[in-house]
């Protein structure tokens, strides 16, 4: 019934849009839709993974991921998928995505992005290792797309790539994460005190630079 009303619900939201399951990782079930028929197909596919589906307005810009460890910014990396969308295939197919560090943005803009990421993580009460994904448009807008407190930790994942660019190799990064976890434990910080497990924000309602004080 809800699918039959999809056009009405979508209304004047516009296209293109990004469709994804609420609780999946690695962009599993994510798709870009250019019209109502594509939206319907994408929603049906996403429902195979989760009973709740997010539809976000597509915003064109430069995708920059920022790595943090215990509130400290490690660095940033620019993501350039050849397909135009950083989906599951772009993440795990060799050669499908170009990773550029430092990002090809003015240095003042990169610092602004990293500052925004740091404030977003702090506002959400994040601790330990996390990754903040930011979309930088041609204008003055910087959108927080996602704060991921369970970032990939294979040697080729983004957080280790960012750490490597900062001179921190994979074993040292793992040790730093463990040291931080031990410190939090000694201070009596429980998992319940870490208020955020995974947050995704629709692009048109995302944090902008002026929203975080």
Task: Outline where the language-model segments fall.
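Flexible, glycine/proline-enriched loop segments at strand-loop-helix junctions
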Residues: 1, 27-33
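ATP-grasp fold ATP-binding core
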Residues: 10-28, 51-60, 64
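ATP-dependent carboxylate activation and anion-phosphoryl transfer catalytic cores
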Residues: 106-213
């Amino acid at each position: 019934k809800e699918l039959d009303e999809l056009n009405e619900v979508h209304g004047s939201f516009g296209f293109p849009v990004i469709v994804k399951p609420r609780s999946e990782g690695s962009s599993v079930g994510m798709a870009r839709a250019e019209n109502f028929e594509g939206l319907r197909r994408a929603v049906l596919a996403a429902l195979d993974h989760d009973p709740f589906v997010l539809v976000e307005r597509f915003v064109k810009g430069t995708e920059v991921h920022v790595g943090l460890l215990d509130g400290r910014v490690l660095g940033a990396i620019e993501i350039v998928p050849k397909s135009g969308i950083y989906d599951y295939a772009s993440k795990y197919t060799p050669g499908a995505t170009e990773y550029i560090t430092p990002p090809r943005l003015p240095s003042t803009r990169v610092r602004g992005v990293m500052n925004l990421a740091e404030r977003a993580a702090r506002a959400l009460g994040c601790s330990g290792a996390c990754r903040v994904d930011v979309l930088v448009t041609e204008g003055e807008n910087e959108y927080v797309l996602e704060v991921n407190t369970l970032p990939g930790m294979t040697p080729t994942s983004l957080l280790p790539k960012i750490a490597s660019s900062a001179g921190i190799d994979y074993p040292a990064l793992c040790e730093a994460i463990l040291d931080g976890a031990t410190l939090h434990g000694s201070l009596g910080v429980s998992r319940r005190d870490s208020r955020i497990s995974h947050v995704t924000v629709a692009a048109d309602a995302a944090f902008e630079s002026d929203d975080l004080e």
